[in-house]
Regions:
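Extended ligand-binding regions for polar small-molecule ligands
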Residues: 27, 41-58, 108, 167, ...
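Bilobed "Venus flytrap"/periplasmic-binding protein-like clamshell domains
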Residues: 95-108, 139-141, 157-215, 230, ...
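Bacterial lipoprotein signal-peptidase II cleavage site
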Residues: 22-38
Length: 278
C-alpha cells in the first residue's frame, strides 16, 4: 500500500535534509575508539525539522481505530540507533531524526501526541498492534514481513556496503568468502549476508563470518575499529555514517537492491492503513 501525498512529501523532504547534514554521525558502543566517540557527539547535535505547524485533519482522525485514539497518543516503535533516520539526542533519551519527524507529523494530522519509544529493531514488528500503534524504523517491505504485518510505503531505499578508507582488507562484494561482514540483527541485509555465508560453505571456500549486532551504531563501529571488514546497511544509513566518520569509511560499489520502505501497521487493520494513505 502507498502513502498519501502529505506523508510522501514529508518523507522525501526530511530524508534529503538528513542526508545533507554534515555535522552529525553515528553513535558508538562502549568499546569504540576515540574517533568514533568524537563522531557520536556530533550526531547528538542534530535538531529535528519543526513540524509544530502540522494541523489536525478531522476527517482523517475519525478514520483511526479506537485502540489508537483512546489514550490520546500515537505510540511508535523505533530503533534509535539508526542515524539519520532515528537516534538519540545529546541527553541520551530524546529520539530525533527524520523518521521521528515523520512520526510527529502523522501524530499532528491525527490530533494525537507523538510517543516514540526506543526498541531493538527485531522486537518492533511483533509488538505492533499491541505495545505500539505503528512501527517506523526504516523497515524494508519484504514478502516475509508482509505475512506478519501490513505496510504503508513512503519512500524507496537500497542497500550499500561500507569499508575503511582505501579498503585495506581488499573486500570484494562479489566474493566475501573469508571476510567478516557486519550487519544489524533482523534486517534484510542480515538475511542476505547469511545466504552468502551459506554459499561460501557450500562451495568449499573460506568461511564468511557474519557479525550481527542489535544496534546499527555497533555495526558501524565494528568496521571503524577493525572488528569487521565491511558493513552492509540501508543506503541512507550507510551514506550518513560514511559522511560523518571523519573520512574513516567509504562506500564500496554502488547502491543495490532498491526497494520500498514503509510504516508498519497491525495485520488487517484497514482503518489505520487507510488513514496513513490519505
Amino acid at each position: 500500500m502507498q502513502a498519501g501525498k502529505a506523508l510522501k512529501t514529508a518523507a522525501a523532504f526530511m530524508l534529503s535534509v538528513a542526508m545533507l547534514a554534515t555535522g552529525a554521525a553515528c553513535g558508538t558502543s562502549d568499546d569504540s575508539d576515540a574517533s568514533a566517540s568524537k563522531s557520536s557527539s556530533k550526531s547528538s547535535e542534530l535538531t529535528g525539522y519543526d513540524v509544530s505547524g502540522v494541523k489536525k485533519d478531522d476527517a482523517i482522525a475519525k478514520m483511526l481505530p479506537d485502540y489508537v485514539t483512546k489514550d490520546g497518543k500515537l505510540t511508535i516503535g523505533m530503533d534509535t540507533s539508526y542515524a539519520p533516520a532515528e537516534f538519540l539526542a545529546a541527553d541520551g533519551k530524546t529520539p530525533v531524526g527524520f523518521d521521528v519527524d515523520i512520526a510527529k507529523a502523522l501524530a499532528g494530522v491525527f490530533g494525537l501526541e507523538a510517543d516514540p519509544e526506543t526498541a531493538n529493531f527485531d522486537s518492533i514488528i511483533p509488538a505492533v498492534g499491541a505495545k505500539y500503534d505503528i512501527g517506523i524504523s526504516s523497515f524494508t517491505v519484504t514478502k516475509e514481513r508482509l505475512e506478519a504485518v501490513d505496510f504503508v510505503s513512503h519512500f524507496n531505499a537500497g542497500s550499500a556496503w561500507a569499508v575503511k578508507k582505501g579498503n585495506p582488507n581488499k573486500v570484494d562484494t562479489s566474493d566475501l568468502c573469508g571476510k567478516k561482514v557486519a550487519v544489524q540483527t533482523a534486517t534484510m541485509q542480515e538475511t542476505a549476508a547469511n545466504k552468502m555465508a551459506k554459499q561460501c560453505k557450500a562451495d568449499g571456500k573460506a568461511e564468511m563470518d557474519v557479525i550481527s549486532s542489535k544496534l546499527q551504531t555497533d555495526v558501524t563501529t565494528n568496521v571503524v575499529t577493525g572488528k569487521a571488514d565491511v558493513f552492509y546497511a540501508d543506503s541512507p544509513v550507510a551514506g550518513y555514517a560514511i559522511a560523518q566518520t571523519d573520512g574513516e569509511l567509504e562506500t564500496l560499489g554502488k547502491t543495490e537492491g532498491i526497494a520500498p520502505e514503509g510504516i508498519v501497521v497491525k495485520k488487517g487493520d484497514q482503518q489505520m492503513d487507510e488513514a496513513l494513505q490519505k
